[in-house]
């Protein structure tokens, strides 16, 4: 699993956005069995075209492309189905990308003023495989755990991975 949406609250916006951009730009994309490669291709030509189409539509809906992973061929695999990490900033919460499971190396950033607003953004999706929060506040962690509508909720972890013995459907 990988997060497809990140929501910052308040002053965390700038430092988080900068850190994510740096991380995305440092990833080595290529053939998965080559030494040092951290990310391989998407599964098919159709998948690549679908993901690139969703990225394009998101910009029409107001998102800014912070890191663009499209049209970056991998040496020796120019016809491969590679999309480098892509980060979209200020994603429209009512846009298609905010409500679609993209299944590609794309992170959509949204920004909220309050925890309540962030939880509302989390709950605005039909799908909710996971939702995670990073906080030093026990009260905020409990509020998020109780109010976020997701199959798996994580506190201070990057991916709330499902356990085989828990029901898991991906729906809110």
Model-derived features: where do they sit?
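Short beta-strand segments
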Residues: 7, 66-69, 133-134
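Helix N-cap motif at beta-to-alpha junctions
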Residues: 10-13, 47, 114, 138
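Flexible, acidic loop-helix segments that line cofactor/substrate-binding pockets
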Residues: 1-5, 21-53, 68-82, 99-104, ...
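Short beta-strand and adjoining strand-loop segment in the mid-core
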Residues: 5-12, 87, 172
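Conserved C-terminal structural/oligomerization subdomain of aldehyde/semialdehyde dehydrogenase
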Residues: 28, 55, 78-172
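Glycine/threonine-rich helix-loop capping motifs at alpha-helix boundaries
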Residues: 11-39, 53-71, 90-97, 147-156
